[in-house]
From Swiss-Prot:
Residue numbers annotated as active site: 106
GO terms classed as biological process: pentose-phosphate shunt, non-oxidative branch
Self-association and partners: Homodimer.
Gene encoding the protein: rpiA
Function field: Catalyzes the reversible conversion of ribose-5-phosphate to ribulose 5-phosphate.
EC primary class: isomerase
Protein name: Ribose-5-phosphate isomerase A
Family note: Belongs to the ribose 5-phosphate isomerase family.
Cross-referenced HAMAP family: Rib_5P_isom_A (MF_00170)
GO molecular function, one term: ribose-5-phosphate isomerase activity
Biological pathway: Carbohydrate degradation; pentose phosphate pathway; D-ribose 5-phosphate from D-ribulose 5-phosphate (non-oxidative stage): step 1/1
């Protein structure tokens, strides 16, 4: 219950940052979905916005709450993107994302956005990325076992993501996901560049130098971590 309330606090604060007429990137995952619902509530108060969804699941939810959607190729900007994260390294605001399988579209929308706002509960703060979760890597199906071997050569332990049925998980782009356990990543920037150079890799879940604001929800309030490294606190519920 405490974690859900923390997420709700962060999501509602993020939704309050959206101004009338904005084009908003809508992230994927349980925390981002709370922000989508909060934006839907604001529509009843007269807020006008256009959403760009990062997954089919998010798009379906946005439509249900009344948010008008556009394709990323039909907009000339994204004013603000709101998304969650699996891990946030507090000093650099580096992110590890992709457990929901939408990392490629999330990264594209995050890069398009003039401002990227990340919402998490305080359990997602880590001293080093990769300390708690494996790094998702999206690869083309053709030759994926070779991609796994090359990731092993980099010190990772890749596992093909599968559904409960045992069938391989497919991203909305039709690709496979390798969850690669590296442990605490000593040099995220090097790993970022190196994995992207592997043939067959579409992208991975390291989002470095992208977050402008991280909203950290807790049982007592929220904490704001900004790119400038300044930190403020509020007990807004």
């Amino acid at each position: 219950m405490g974690t859900e309330r923390a997420k709700e606090r962060a999501a509602r604060f993020a939704a309050s940052l959206v101004e009338d007429g904005m084009i908003v990137g809508l992230g994927s995952g349980s925390t981002a979905e709370l922000a989508v619902r909060a934006l839907g509530e604001r529509l009843h108060d007269g807020l006008r916005l256009i959403g760009v969804a990062t997954s089919q699941r998010t798009a379906a939810l946005a439509r249900r709450v009344g948010i008008e959607l556009r394709d990323p190729d039909s907009v000339d900007r994204i004013d603000l993107a709101i998304d969650g994260a699996d891990e946030v390294e507090e000093r650099s605001l580096g992110l590890l994302k992709g457990r929901g399988g939408a990392l490629v579209r999330e990264k594209l929308v995050a890069r398009m956005a003039r401002r990227l706002v990340i919402i998490i509960d305080d359990s997602k703060l880590v001293a080093a990325l990769g300390a708690r979760f494996p790094l998702p890597v999206e690869v083309v199906p053709f030759g994926w076992r070779w991609c796994a071997r090359w990731l092993e050569d980099l010190g990772g332990r890749p596992t093909l993501r599968c559904r409960p049925t045992g069938h391989p998980f497919r991203s909305d782009n039709g690709n496979l996901i390798l969850d690669v356990a590296f442990g605490a990543i000593a040099d995220p920037a090097w790993l970022d560049r190196t994995i992207k150079m592997l043939p067959g890799v579409i992208d991975h879940g390291l989002f470095l130098d992208m977050a402008d604001l991280v909203i950290v929800g807790s049982e007592t309030g929220i904490r704001l971590l900004e790119r400038s490294r300044t930190v403020s606190e509020t007990s807004k519920s």
